[in-house]
A protein has these predicted regions:
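Beta-propeller blade termini and top-face loops
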Residues: 39-531
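Bacterial Sec-dependent N-terminal signal peptides
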Residues: 1-42
Length: 531
C-alpha cells in the first residue's frame, strides 16, 4: 500500500488519476499536521534540575522506637561474668548486656545483617564469640543470612569466616577446651536445594571448614549438641524441609538423629534405634544431660512423635510424653533442654515455657514476659541463671525462671509497613511482628520520644495501617487471615470490617470465600478520599 504521507507517492498518484487529487490533498494535509506535531514532541526534554545534596547532608536517622523487643531465636551467657549475656535478633542483629539485662546495646551494626540464627561464646576464651546468620524459625516471612561471623574482642569488631551459602545456621557449638574447634549445624536454602548444608567443622578458628556430615541437597542439620563431659561425643539432627511462598513441607527421607564418638570424623545414624518413631519424621530437637550423660532427650515431629528419653546414650528410647502443648507448630519450636545439675528437670520451648521435674513425663507452664519461645541458655555452673529468647526479644532470670528482666529495653522490632497521617503534628503508624500495631506523633512536648508516647491502633501484628485522609483519628488496620479493623481514637469505638466476616483460624481452605497473604495492602484513593 502506498505511503500517502510520502510526497513522491503523492505526486505519482495525482498524475495518474486526477479524480482523486482533492482527496489526496486532504489526506496530505492531515499527514503534514501529524508530522509537524511529532517533530514538536521530539524536541529534547528539559534537563532535570540539579539537587543540592548539601541540603540533606546533615540529616541523620534517629530511633523513635518502639523499645519493646522483636523476635529472638539465639541466646547465650558468659561463664566468667554473671551479668554478661548476648542475644541474636531476627531483625536487629546481636545485642549485649553487662548488667544482667537491665540495658542492652547493639554490637553488630555495620558488620552484618539483622537475622541471627545462632550465637555461641567460647568457654575457654569468652572474648571469642561466633554468630551464625539466618533465622532458624522457618516462617513464610523468614529472613535468611550470610554465613558465620567471629569476634575476638567481646563483640567490639567482627569478621566474616565463611559458610556464606548456608543461609540458615541453626546451632553453633564450640569445643569447651579449644576455642579453635567449632561445629556448625546448617539447614541450607529453605526454598530450594543446595549443597552447603549439614554439619561443618573448623579446627582453626573459622579460617577453613570441612563438611563432616551431609545427607543430601534437600536435608539440612537443625540441631547440634555436645556431651558436656566428653567433647568427642556429639548428636546432630537432620530435617527434610521445604518452603514455598504459600506452603511448608516438613518431614521426609533423611530426617533423623546422628551420633559421633570421635569428634565428628565418623557418624552413626541412630534413627532406627528401638523406641524411636519409624514413620515420617520432621524437625527434631535434642539434648544431653550434663549430670548423667547417658541420658538423652529428644522432641520429635511425626504422627507418632512426642518427647523421647534414652537412658543408655541413645541405644534405646522410651516415649515419655505426647502432650500437644509441647508439640504444636513443631516447625516453629521443637527445642528441648536439660538442667545441667538435675537429669530429671527438662525444659521444652513452645508458645509457653514448659518445665518438667519428673524426667519429661509431665510439664508445668512457667510464666514469662512474652510468648512463643525459641531458645534457652542455662548456666552449667548455676542453673538458676538463664536467658530465654522469644517473640518479644530476650529476658534473663537469676532464680530459675520465676522472675525475668524486661523486654521493653531492646528496640529490635520488625515493623511491616510504615505510614503517616495528615494530622499536625503528623503521626507515624506501623505494625510490629509478634506484638501489636502502633502509632506515635513524630515529635513530643518533652523533647524526646519514649515508650510512653506510643499507643495501640487498628489492626494487629502483620497488617498495613492507614489513617483516613479526612479524619486522622479514624484508622484502619489489617492482620493475617484477612482481618480488617477500624478504630476511632477520639470516641474509642472499634469495629470489625473484614471483607468476609467468618473467623478463618482453624478452618480448611475449602471453607474460605477468599484467601489472603500474611500481609495485604490497604490504601485510600488519592482522588476520592472516602474510597
Amino acid at each position: 500500500m502506498p505511503n500517502f504521507c510520502n510526497p513522491i507517492a503523492f505526486r505519482l498518484l495525482s498524475a495518474t488519476n486526477p479524480y482523486i487529487m482533492k482527496k489526496l490533498l486532504f489526506v496530505f494535509a492531515i499527514c503534514l499536521s501529524i508530522t509537524t506535531q511529532a517533530q514538536k514532541a521530539a524536541k529534547p526534554a528539559v534537563a532535570a534540575l540539579p539537587f543540592d545534596t548539601s541540603i540533606t547532608a546533615e540529616l541523620k536517622f534517629r530511633n523513635i522506637g518502639p523499645w519493646r523487643g522483636g523476635r529472638s531465636t539465639a541466646v547465650v551467657g558468659d561463664l566468667q561474668n554473671d551479668q554478661l549475656f548476648y542475644f541474636g535478633s531476627t531483625g536487629g542483629g546481636v545485642w549485649k548486656t553487662n548488667d544482667g539485662g537491665s540495658n542492652w546495646k547493639n554490637i553488630s551494626d555495620g558488620y552484618f545483617g539483622g537475622s541471627v540464627g545462632s550465637i555461641a561464646v567460647s568457654k575457654s576464651d569468652p572474648s571469642i564469640i561466633y554468630a551464625g546468620m539466618g533465622e532458624n524459625t522457618m516462617r513464610g516471612n523468614v529472613s535468611e543470612g550470610f554465613g558465620m561471623w567471629k569476634s575476638e574482642n567481646g563483640g567490639r569488631s567482627w569478621k566474616n569466616v565463611g559458610l556464606n551459602d548456608t543461609r540458615h545456621i541453626m546451632r553453633i557449638v564450640i569445643h569447651p577446651k579449644d576455642e579453635n574447634v567449632i561445629y556448625v549445624a546448617a539447614l541450607g536454602h529453605l526454598f530450594g536445594p543446595n549443597a552447603e548444608r549439614g554439619v561443618f567443622r573448623s579446627k582453626n578458628g573459622g579460617q577453613s571448614w570441612e563438611k563432616i556430615l551431609y545427607v543430601n541437597d534437600q536435608v539440612g542439620a537443625c540441631d547440634l549438641v555436645i556431651d558436656p563431659t566428653d567433647p568427642n561425643i556429639l548428636l546432630a539432627t537432620f530435617w527434610n524441609v521445604k518452603r514455598t511462598p504459600f506452603s511448608l513441607e516438613s518431614g521426609g527421607p533423611g530426617s533423623g538423629i546422628y551420633k559421633t564418638i570421635d569428634g565428628g570424623n565418623n557418624w552413626t545414624n541412630i534413627t532406627k534405634n528401638k523406641g524411636l518413631p519409624q514413620d515420617t519424621l520432621g524437625i527434631i530437637g535434642i539434648t544431653i544431660s550434663a549430670s548423667n550423660p547417658e541420658i538423652y532427650y529428644a522432641i520429635i515431629e511425626s504422627k507418632t512423635g512426642g518427647i523421647f528419653k534414652s537412658i543408655d546414650a541413645g541405644k534405646t528410647w522410651t516415649k515419655t510424653s505426647d502432650d500437644s502443648n509441647q508439640r504444636q507448630r513443631a516447625w516453629y519450636f521443637s527445642k528441648i533442654f536439660c538442667d545441667p545439675k538435675n537429669e530429671n528437670v527438662v525444659y521444652v520451648l513452645n508458645v509457653e515455657f514448659w518445665k518438667s521435674t519428673d524426667g519429661a513425663k509431665t510439664f508445668k507452664s512457667i510464666s514469662t514476659p512474652h510468648g512463643d519461645h525459641h531458645d534457652l541458655w542455662i548456666d552449667p555452673n548455676n542453673p538458676q541463671r538463664m536467658i530465654i529468647g522469644d517473640d518479644g526479644g530476650a529476658q534473663t532470670s537469676f532464680d530459675g525462671g520465676y522472675n525475668w528482666s524486661t523486654y521493653h529495653n531492646q528496640p529490635t522490632a520488625q515493623i511491616y509497613r510504615v505510614s503517616t497521617d495528615n494530622a499536625v503534628p503528623y503521626r507515624i503508624y506501623g505494625a510490629q511482628q509478634d506484638n501489636t500495631s502502633l502509632r506515635i506523633r513524630h515529635r513530643s512536648r518533652g523533647g524526646q520520644i519514649d515508650d510512653n508516647d506510643w499507643e495501640p491502633t487498628a489492626g494487629f501484628e502483620s497488617g498495613f495501617i492507614v489513617a483516613s485522609p479526612i479524619n486522622s483519628e479514624i484508622v484502619y488496620g489489617g492482620n493475617y487471615s484477612g482481618f480488617i479493623g477500624c478504630i476511632n481514637h477520639k470516641t474509642g469505638d472499634a469495629r470489625n470490617i473484614t471483607v468476609w466476616p467468618n473467623d478463618p483460624l482453624g478452618q480448611g481452605e475449602g471453607t474460605q470465600a477468599y484467601r489472603y497473604q500474611w500481609t495485604f495492602p490497604l490504601l485510600f484513593s488519592p482522588h476520592k478520599p472516602r474510597r
